[in-house]
Amino acid sequence: MRFLFLLCCWVISFPTYCGAVEVTPQVEQWGTAEVSLPGPSKGNPFSDVLLSAKFYEGETSIEVDGFYDGDGVYRLRFMPEKQGKWRFVTKSNVPELDAQEGEFTVTAPTGNNHGPVRVANTFHFAYADGTPYKQLGTTCYVWNHQPAELQAKTLETLADSPFNKLRFCVFPKRYKWNENEPELYPFEGKPPRTWNTERFDPKFFQHLDQCVLELQKLGIEADIILLHPYDEGHWGFDRMTPVEDDRYLKYVVSRLAAYRNVWWSLANEYDFMTEKREEDWERIGELVAAEDRFEHLLSIHNGKRLFNQTRPWLTHASIQNGSAVEDPARAELFRDAFRKPIVFDEVKYEGNIPKRWGNISAEELVHRFWAGTIGGTYVGHGETYLSPDDILWWSKGGVLKGESPPRLEFLRKVLADSPAEGIDPIDKWQNPEYAGKSAEYYLIYLGKEKPTEWLFKLPNPPQLVGLPPAEKMTFTAEVLDAWNMTVTPVEGTFTLKKLDDYFYGDTKGRKIKLPGKPYQVIRIKRVHDSD
């Protein structure tokens, strides 16, 4: 009879296993497989219970930590990077959670599932399946702490925007234009300062899960800011002890690391968190990198003092520096210094608030995006227009009011048409306005200059195996207006001849006519025999 009962249990619940262990039966490659188990709710499940599981397929084996999700439910999340049949077995100090086994099937990815974003070609990014990722991010620091209706409006706005990354905070923010209390808090307790940091509020983190997944549906990366200084003791989340920090970070990573669109930002303006020292950030960075078994991108954002961006656990440099992207040459220097992708996540914001960091023009912000791009780096957007209801995009989200987003959509289309490997400086020591892929694709950004013509000339193309001699290379040209969002083809083609030690020009010595306006870009592409 007992055998018959077990057989019925297996048939009825497959692939939900006996003992009420539930597992996602089928998941896409780079999707999220979730295992749910019932367990003890007495005492403090967050600290008393240890739970992990080993997931394996063939010779591949990955161990992840589980977490308590409230109401007697424990979860383990896993992001499979291989297709096939995966199995798991749990390990716990609680007998009812220990040695639980199961399996699930991983299928091919569909739709906009290209996997997590990784570093590619030293200075650039690509999804795990090799699809290029050209970062065009924006910032809504605490959109996730606003009323549900406003959160929905933010997602609606993002869906119709050019942005493919959103920076936002786990913890709420206390700052000018952002003084409302959130509806949920990360810990059990009583606001504003009475918290039991040993007990998390699962509802807070369940909502965070949902925010990440909503962005994933839109194809937007979630650049999650784990710590920030915009508290100043109001809640005290910026002044937790190292033990409290570590416990919180482990919990967040165990919950979110299995979502493919997650990026980690250890802190925003880390150096403004005066309670922490450099060794604290080293510990925090090493901890997050070690706890994340899926190796998501990881960065730390600066205020006035740059962090040591050469640290091996930092995958890319997240930089605040508006002047660095006023021209391409300055932006490019950061690449040489750190030898990894550079994302200028904060270059000041389009807006009109009475703060110098939040009142640059749309023209200036768009210019900085282009200058950063030509420097072989990436730039982030923000918007701070005053509003009677204190809903500013940079903090609370809502709707975009500025003039830069349509121009950034134009840039997005240009980037989508650019070389998959990324845009790199071509003549950085002398003519930093040239970028692209030498001998194949060029963007020459003239910035704030207002020329009426441009002599066709290209820095010496490389003489590599598979490339024709320079004198046999032919190119087409277009004039792009970065502000007016126009593309004007230039008539005819251009065949190279040597001008001097550094440049090749057109055999006919032609010049390209320009409108005498700023923000002009000349796009040049080599003509192939198959074209």
State what each model feature region is.
Residues 34, 69-77, 502-508:
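Aromatic sugar-binding surface patches on proteins
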Residues 111-327:
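Active-site mouth of glycoside hydrolases
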Residues 247, 268-406:
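Extracellular glycoside hydrolase catalytic/binding regions
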Residues 21-59, 64-67, 103-109, 115, ...:
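Non-catalytic, glycine-rich low-complexity segments
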Residues 1-4, 256:
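Positively charged n-region of N-terminal signal peptides that target proteins for export
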